[in-house]
Amino acid sequence: LHARVRQWARLTDPETDAPLEVVLFRRMAALVAVVMIGVVIPTNRLLGLPLVVDVVALGLGLVSGYFAWRSRRGHHAMLPFWCMNLVSLDLAFFVSFGADGSVLAWFYPLAALTVGMFEGRRRLIALLVLGLDALALLAIDFARPELVSRPASRVTRFEDLATGHISALVTTMLVVGLVLSAYRREQARREATNRALAGSRD
């Protein structure tokens, strides 16, 4: 898995002088595009979930890919990318079984993405919004259960929970791997710069 992460990192970000947060944003946007289109949509089709879930996933994947492409050209829409992911999860919650489904598990990779992509007060605010949003979804599910679709059977619920949690776990691991890869890259760049400066003094 680590080798795959490093290969993906080299493919999506050949630059060596981009800021750390830009590198993370670009790689994560590309990762979301691949996961949504290559993993989530095929899994949803196997589970027979409503077509609207695939529409949300496809839209998220395409726009994320566009954000990654635009970032290569100097436009880094980090906050819109984060907000788009959160809104997509909110929409999917109501049509993918609510608290009985696996949508809330996808808040964990989004939290990992938040930690890697933002810093300081912005990171704290984003994590707070993320937590409050998840609690609000649970409260709506409890107070107005008629607003949320439900699985047709226990088997459907089991399949959704199993595939959703495993996919979310793997995605979280990939996000953390990208964060660590970008951090090591930044450390190596700084060490090379320091060595060059030390050599110039000599």
PLM-predicted stretches and their roles:
Residues L1-P19:
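Short, Lys/Arg-rich, polar N-terminal cytosolic tail immediately upstream
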Residues P19-V32, L51, G120-L128, R157-V170:
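Alpha-helical transmembrane segments and their helix-membrane boundary motifs
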Residues V23-D100, W106-T114, L128-L135:
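Hydrophobic transmembrane alpha-helices and their membrane-interface boundaries in multi-pass
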Residues T43, F94, V176-L180, R184:
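Membrane-water interface at transmembrane helix exits
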Residues L110-A126, L169-S181:
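Short helix-perturbing small/polar motifs within transmembrane alpha-helices
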Residues D133-R144:
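C-terminal TM-helix exit segments that contain a strictly Trp-centered aromatic cap at the helix terminus
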Residues P145-V155:
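Membrane-interface helix termini and inter-helical loops of multi-pass transporters
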Residues T172, V179-R201:
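Amphipathic coiled-coil signal-transmission "stalk" helices
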